[in-house]
């Protein structure tokens, strides 16, 4: 079933992605990430930071690059961070010191899903400042992330 809606970056995300096996992860690193970083270095543009590669895996199992960003992807990051058990700040500092390869990254086994709630009409023309009443309360197994929301003068979430 096709979703007929405007397509901003994404309407949701999940982690882990079943298609990203250890073999696929290694393949992406060897065929996409490493050549990208090596290519930047060869052109005198060494890079330290987040390199987000938006990928699609085609029917033949070949990873294809849709986009690169030098930041976390949104909303992809939220489900990923819910699974990260390692200290993100320690990883960032290690990257700055060129010691990221010495860090152990630990993930929990849980599945995490993020769903975007957006105003009617988003991302085109949509009403701003309207009350938001449909966000469920956080529980021990859920977390609410906000983007583009605020409390108005009456403390109503808008």
Segment roles from a protein language model:
Residues 137-158:
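Internal helix-turn-beta structural module
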Residues 1-24, 75-80:
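Glycine-rich phosphate-binding loop of ATP-grasp-fold ATP-dependent ligases
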Residues 60-61, 155:
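Detector for glycine-centered tight turns/loop "hinges" at secondary-structure junctions
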Residues 29-43, 48-51, 69-138, 152:
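Active-site "cap" helix and flanking loop/linker of ATP-utilizing ligase/carboxylase catalytic domains
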Residues 12, 63-64, 112-115, 141-144:
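Structural motif
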Residues 1-6, 53-57, 63-72, 148-149:
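Short beta-strand elements
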Residues 1-3, 102-104, 150-157:
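Short beta-strand/turn micro-motifs at beta-sheet edges
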Residues 14-16, 57-58, 82, 118:
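Short beta-strand-to-turn element immediately C-terminal to the catalytic PLP-Schiff-base lysine
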């Amino acid at each position: 079933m096709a979703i007929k809606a405007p397509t901003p970056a994404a309407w949701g995300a999940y982690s882990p992605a079943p298609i990203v096996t250890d073999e696929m992860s290694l393949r992406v690193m060897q065929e996409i990430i490493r050549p990208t970083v090596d290519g930047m270095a060869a052109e005198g543009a060494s890079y330290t930071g987040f390199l987000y590669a938006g990928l699609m895996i085609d029917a033949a199992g070949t990873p294809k690059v849709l986009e690169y960003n030098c930041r976390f992807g949104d909303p992809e990051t939220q489900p990923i961070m819910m699974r990260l058990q390692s200290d993100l700040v320690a990883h960032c500092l290690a990257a700055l010191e060129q010691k990221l390869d010495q860090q152990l990254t630990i993930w929990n086994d849980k599945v995490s899903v993020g769903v975007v709630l957006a105003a009617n009409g988003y991302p085109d023309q949509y009403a701003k400042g309207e009350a938001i009443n449909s966000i469920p309360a956080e529980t021990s197994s859920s977390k609410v992330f906000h983007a583009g929301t605020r409390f108005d003068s009456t403390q109503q979430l808008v």
